[in-house]
Structures are given as structure tokens and as C-alpha cells.
Amino acid sequence: MTPTLRTLPIGPGPGFWPELARQLIDAAPDLSRVRVLVPTYVHIVHLRQALAGHLGSSFIPPEIRTLSDWLAALPPGDEPPPAAPGERLMELYAQLRELGWLKKLFDAKRNTDLLPLARTLLSLADELTAALLPAALAQPEDVEDRWHAALQQLSPQAAALLSSESQLVWNLWHAQRDARDPGVVRHAMLQRLARSADRPLFWCAPYEPGALETEFLNTHAQHQPVTVFRLDWSAHALPLTWQRCWNELCDDSSTGAVTLTVPPALPDSLSLHPARSLEHEAQSAASTIIGWLQQGLQKLLIVPQDRVVARRVRALLERAQVVVADETGWKLSTTRAAAVLAAWLDLVAAQGRPQPLLDFIKSPFLFADPDAEGELRLSVERALATGELPSGWPGIKACMDDLPEAKRLIDIMAREAERFSGRRTVPEWVAITLGAFDALGMLAAMKEDVAGSQVMAMMESLASECEAIDAEFSLAEWRALLNLQLEQSEFVALRVDQRVRMVPLNGVPLREFDAAIIVGADAAHLPSPPADTLFFANSVRRELGLATREERARQQLRDFACLLMSCPRVVVSWRTQIDGEANLVSPWLQRLQLELRRETALVKEAVLPAHEVQVGTATFTEQLPQMPAPRAPALLPAHLSASGYNSLMACPYQFFASRMLRLREAEELSELPEKRDYGQWLHRLLQRYHETVAEQGTPVEQRAALMDTISDEVFAAALERQPAALGYAMRWKKHAPAYVEWANTREAEGWRFAFGEQERKVTLDIAGHSLTLMGRLDRLDKHDDGRLAVIDYKTADKGALKKKLASLDDHQLAFYGLLMSPRPAEAAYVAIDSDKTEALTAEPYDEWCDALEQRLVQDLEGIARGEPLPASGVSSSCQYCDARGVCRKGAW
């Protein structure tokens, strides 16, 4: 047999595999003595089924495999092992970060900005290798001539912008193309395979072979015959409708004269589903898939042109217990395991700031017991929110003194975080990161999780690939590398059910499905937006033999046509409106519709049919909500504060939810100081000021200096933890003289500071229940004549305080009177955050206290008797109420 290479085109459509099987049987009666290469393992199944259709169940099949599988089985040769992706990336990055001119050229503000650039440069170098390596090895001068000819295609303006970047890529390609270049190694292995060929080869692929594969086939044909089966895109192999609408599908342009007099045929397989919204499109797609399954269809396809819609479809199907075998590949960065890794590195970089700590302890891998996880997380959050916001690990630890389990965990975190310092090699960074997870007890849980095990494997692979690199990297560079790897890696989910598959459009050719639905087939997503061709203009790519935008768009259209011709049912779905604006269907379908409508006189049904979706309905009994008014005498609280009683007065249901059921939102943790923190600082410094004056008898003329000293000390400690407190420090410095002047005047009137910041309690008997009233007094003054006065510091506006006292809506001062025996003679709010400090006295105070005592006992006894607690609060009380979502005001 004389070795030959021949090409046999087969038209796209459902008959591709049966025709290939027939031609294979005709060409090789003894199938066991030939080898067939197909693109993927799925195609192996299709070919075997087609052969069985011709030969029956009893036959010896040919050797059917993929090219990658064949290469992997090749015994080691003289080629060195190819450089691993991680090794190539970090070696190139380590070189690029030393080039100051390169940072200036690409406007890189930080070294880490060069890491994505390094990946892009390597990708372009690999693309050049795949297209030009055989020519570069055979005739290097011709390749250089092609390069210079390509640059000549640029306009002078484009050349001025792109010449430096393009030359950089070209030089990098020459520098990277050594014996360990993956493309060079692959080429050598392919040639070794071809030279050792021992049987005829049948090559089957939906696309034209690349330069390396073409060289492989040519070499193989010199030793054993090669037959290439490819898709036939000539005019005679395509339906006339497709030729009329999409003439760029064809390899030749001689279709017009043949088809002008022939009316276009309405495609039998295609129907359209215009959706009103994203949710409507997703629900319709999910209902369509479920309907097909109920009809007994077993091979269903979802083409996710719009990933947002596709995610929603998948969620709806999983809710219906229909598992989707996703071949599109979700980014590993979107998994919760990757989020935990990112949260840990954020915490390390933040050096123990509270918010990153709270984000990290939400990790599902950190606690073996979910109940303990919730309790510990809540206790840590409360500990951080109750006092001043701590800064750094020492401050965090100090907040956990009453939480031994939390403190133990924080100690481990702080110890492990200290190891993330300095510059280290990639394997060292991997070891430190995995060591931290092990110390925190997370490693086992991560490995048991599907995504977690893949994240661990990715890091271990990265360490192995970069073992030979001596360059050291900072924590910021390590984080950037991990983020890049997680973004580039695909999450491979376990596939249990294979009936419904989600496959990208370029994975559809030569595959068989019973029905398919394309979601997101609007003009923005079908065809997919062209990928950026950085560094090389389209004309340069064309001259060098690289894929151009036009070629990629044409290939997308051919993939789409393959689906329409091979699948008996295809539904195309899209949203007709987005944000109130019209959203057009894919231009490919617009062209098809126009072509059909143009021939209305010849074709009765000139419009593509609409897909009817059968959505299941459910009947519910309507029950109008009513205002809640629970009765809960058994839940009468054992303790009550002034704010708690104010809540009862504002809305009984709010009191029921917050004080009796204890349904309170966790306080939000802000890393910036708030007015609450400002109030705590003022309370602290005023307490110190008055105690010092009382103990030392500080003369009046020295008190302003004393206030400045104490204020500086208190705010210096605050600024050390939170530099953003500077604004509050300057604010108090402006108002402090007014307070000192007011305090001196009050002392001259006979009032003396007695004590401050003191807890007071009193126990009442409420219908047989013991209930303790409790509160913390800011300050108590005693007059020379023996009278007592309650002082409460306020940073609120004077007008708001006066309004509060006049309306008697706030019972705080009167409530404090109930805690004192003997009862104070007067009480006042002191507005301290003002240019003029002023005491706003509650009058008549004694009558107010008596009325409050009578009403408080009456209200609490009513609760103990089982009186209702209606949601009767006014709008101002509801505006910021945590129980609003529980009482559902507005729905009744």
C-alpha cells in the first residue's frame, strides 16, 4: 500500500456519523487494523453507535481515541519534559517586574499589574507557536518575511501605537521557543508518533487541523495512509435556506445563481421564545426541559449564551431535582472554597481588622459543628460591636477575654498570620497557606468538599510546577497569583445525571441531541462578543495565519448551523426588553426572518414559529394578613431598661419581638468611628475630668488645661486604634471650652459632682413575677443643700432634645428617677456637642416620675395578665424598626 493523504468531506447534520461509519467500513474491511482519532470521548460513543448501526452488535471495533490520549500513552523519548504553566508564568513575571520601561509602557502602577500581562504574552506566544512553528523550523527566513509583511499592513497611525507592543510579543516568542516550550515538545511528540505509525489513520474533527496537526498528518501519510473526515461546507451540502440567509457559511461563493429562483424553506426544527424578563426566560427554559424529560427525551442540551440566565435555569432545574451536567466550566473563583481562601488572605493583609475577621469566621469549613459555629460567630460579633472597635490582633484578643473558645481560635489566627510576612518562593507560600488551614482545622473539611479539594489540588500543583523557580515573591504577589489561577481554573462538578447537558456553542458540532434550547440569544450574546486581540491588529493576525475576528465569527455561525441541522428540536430564547429598552434577537435570526418575509408570496408561513411553554400552575387559598397582637404572659422579661420601656411605649409588638422574643438584628460593625464611639469617648474623658477635679480640687483657672490634657490622652488612644477618629477629636476640641465654662458655672450655683457611670437597679413585684429595672447613670450631682440631680450627656441637637422633653415621648430621665432612693429633685439632658453647653431640665420631674411608675406597673401587669401586644406604632417608630419584617406592616 502506497501511503497517501486524502480528505473526505461529509455534510453537517444527523447523518454525519452514519456516513462516516459507512465510509470507514468501505475503506477498511478489517476495522481492527486501523486507528481513528476523534475530538473528545463523547465522539467515541457516537462513532461506536454508528458502526453498530451498520454492522450489528458483533464486530471488532477500530482503535478509537483522542489525540491527547494517544500522546499521553507515548513512551518517553528524547524530548525534555515541557515547562509547566505555573513555572512559565512566574519565570516570565519575575523577569518583567525588573523592567522599568515595561511598567511605564503599560502604565503598571504595581508589580502585580504585570501578572495578567505575563499570562497574555504567554498565550500569544503559544498561539504563534501553534501557527508558525513548522514553518519556523523549516524556513525561518520566510517566517521573518511574513512578520515584516504583516507590519506593513498597519496604517502609519496604528503602527505608531502597536509597533512596540507587537515587537515585544514577537521577541518574546523567539525567546520562549526553547526545547521545553510546550508547543515545541508537542510538535516533537507528534512527529515521533507519525514516524512510528503502524496502521492507517482516520482523522475526524469539526474544524480544520492547525499547523502542528497538519504537519503531523503529512508526516504520518509518508508512512501510513491518512484519511481526513471534515465537515463539508460547500454549497451543495447545505440547505438552500442557510445559503440564502448566511452565505458566509459556504466555502465557495457560487450559491446565488442556484438559489435565487428557489424559495427558502421554513426550518422544521427551529422555534423562537421571546421572554418578558430574565425570570420569565429562565422559568420558560426550565419548564421546557422538564416537559421534554416527561416526554421521554434523554439527550437534552442547554446552550448558555447568557451566563446569568443559564445560572438561573440551572438553579430552577436543581430545585426540581433535575441535575445539569455542566460542560461550560464554572470558574473556581466563584466557589465557596475559593471565597474562604480569599477571606483568609484578606484577613492576613488587614493585620487583624474586625470586618475581615467576621468575614472569615463565616467560613463553612472553620467549624465542624454548625451549631457551635453560629453561637461562636455571634458571640465574636457582639464582643467586637459592644465596645470601641479594636485595631490589630492584640485589640481583637482583648475583646475575647470572656470567650475562651473564641480567644483560642483568635490566637491561632494571629500566630498563623504572622508567618505571612517577607518574600518567599511559590512552594513556600503554598506550604504556609496550607499550614494555616491545617492549624485552623480546615484542611480536612476543604479536602472533603468537591470545590475545596480542587482548590487544594490547584495550590499543590502550583507548588510542584514552580519548584525550580528561585525567585521570591511578596504576599501581594502571592495573592495576585492565586486570584489569577482561581479565575483561570474551571470547577469540575460531579456529573451523576447525563440527560441534561449545558454545553457551549463551540462544543456542539458532531454531537447528537434530542432537543436543545439556547438561552440569551439576543444581539449582545449571539454571536458572542469577539475576544480582544491585544498587541496584534486583525490585519497582522491574518498575515501571520492567526485566527481573525471574521474567522472566529464565521466559525461561531457554523457551530450554530451545525446545531440547527443536527438537532430535531431547537428553541431560541431571549429577553425582549432589558431595563425598559428593546432588546433585539440575534442578528443571525433577524437575517433569517427577513429572508423568509421577503419571499412571502412564495412561502405562506414566512415567520418562524413561536415555542409554546406549558408552565405548571398551583392554586393557593388567599388569606389576608392582619395586624399581629400576640399575648405572651410567660415571656415577661426579668429585666427592663429605659430603652426597653421606650420600645413598649413606641409599639407593643416591637417590645414583644425585641425584648420578649429577643429578635434583634446584630449590630453592624463599621471600621470607621461612629457617633456612638464619639459618645463613649466623651463619657470617658468627662468621667476622668470630674473625678480629677473632685479629688485634687483643681483651681478654676487650671481646669481648661486639665480638660485639654485628658481629652488629648483619650483621643490619642482612640487615634492609635482608629486614625479616622481625628475628625471627632477636632470637633470636641472646639466644644470643650464651652463645657468647662458650663461646669464651672454649675459648681458656682452649688452643685457638686457626686459620681458618674454607675449601674443602678431596683426590683419590682409584677403580678407575682420579679422584674428588675436597671440603668446606667451618666452622672449624679449633689447640691450644697442636699438635693440630687440626674445628668445625662447628649451629643444630639438642642432642638431635638427640647422637643423630646416637651412631648414626653422619651422616658429615660424619669426612668432613672425610679432607680434612685431617695428620688432626685431634678434631672436634665446636657447638650455637650455644641458651641454653648446647656442643661435642658425636665419639669416637673417629680410628677413625671410618679406618673411613669404608675403607668409602668400598669403596663407590665397587663402583659402578665395576657393582654395583647398590637403592632400599633406610628410611622416614625416603624421607620428604623428591626421588627418591621416580622409584623409585616404595610401588608395589612
Feature locations, PLM:
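Metal-dependent nuclease catalytic regions and adjoining charged, substrate-binding loops involved
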Residues: 817-892
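Non-catalytic protein-protein interaction segments used by genome-maintenance enzymes to assemble
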Residues: 755-823
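C-terminal, charged and often intrinsically disordered regions of DNA end-processing helicases
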Residues: 286, 293, 590-690, 874-875, ...
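C-terminal accessory regions
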Residues: 365, 546-597, 816, 857-880
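Nucleic acid-machinery interaction/catalytic patches
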Residues: 1-544, 548, 597-601, 667, ...
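Active-site-adjacent bridging/hinge elements
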Residues: 262, 535-541, 652-663, 708-712, ...
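Short, contiguous acidic/charged loop-to-helix segments that flank catalytic cores in large enzymes
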Residues: 469, 491-492, 547-551, 669-673, ...
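Short, glycine-/Ser/Thr-/acidic-enriched flexible segments
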Residues: 13, 43, 208, 233-235, ...
